[in-house]
UniProtKB/Swiss-Prot annotation:
One of its GO terms (cellular component) is cytoplasm. Pfam families: SprT-like. Binds 1 zinc ion. Belongs to the SprT family. It is found in: Cytoplasm. The gene is sprT. It comes from Pseudomonas putida (strain GB-1). Keywords: Cytoplasm, Metal-binding, Zinc. Zn(2+) binds at residues 69, 73. This is Protein SprT. Residues 14-156 form the SprT-like domain.
Length: 164
């Protein structure tokens, strides 16, 4: 686990403990998060998950804003219980009062989309190319058939692929 992030989680908890004058249990920290989310707080498991790729690409802002954002969710839940809204007044109070940060709901990190392979199927129609996903291509190989909506012919794999 990146040490700077672990240290920032601890710093956020120390700030919350000083502000609220009470201790908070420390969460488990995981980097098993992919896709568009920078972080997720699992309230009942006392677990923080962070996106390692987004952390590496946006380290300074991630440490300052994202870590505090997720810790604030756990602190708010431990202080106010289940009945609060995720980005409601209580969470905003913690972001502004404890961490002196804007209570931004979402990050604006650039997220690289994964390249996907499309399998090109054809029919006799003009503009008769149909890009299939890997899952649909596998179903065809297992015997499923797909028809062109215009000419009702069975779509046939052309042997071509395209990366998008």
């Amino acid at each position: 686990m990146p040490e700077l992030l672990k240290e920032r989680v601890e710093t956020c908890y120390q700030q919350a403990e000083t502000f609220f004058k009470r201790p908070f249990p420390r969460p488990e920290v995981s980097f098993k998060l992919r896709g568009q989310k920078a972080g997720v707080a699992h309230l009942h498991e006392n677990l923080l998950r962070f996106n390692l790729q987004l952390y590496r690409e946006n380290q300074e802002d991630f440490l300052r804003q994202t870590v505090a954002h997720e810790v604030a969710h756990l602190v708010a839940h431990q202080l106010f219980g289940d009945s609060i809204q995720a980005h409601g007044e209580e969470w905003q109070l913690i972001m502004r009062g404890v961490y002196e940060l804007p209570p931004n709901r979402c990050h604006n990190y650039e997220v690289q989309r994964r390249a996907t392979t499309r399998y090109i199927y054809r029919c006799p129609c003009p503009q008769g190319d149909f890009p299939f996903t890997a899952q649909r291509h596998k179903l065809v190989r297992q015997g499923r058939r797909y028809l062109c909506k215009r000419c009702r012919a069975i779509l046939v794999y052309s042997g071509e692929t395209r990366v998008e």
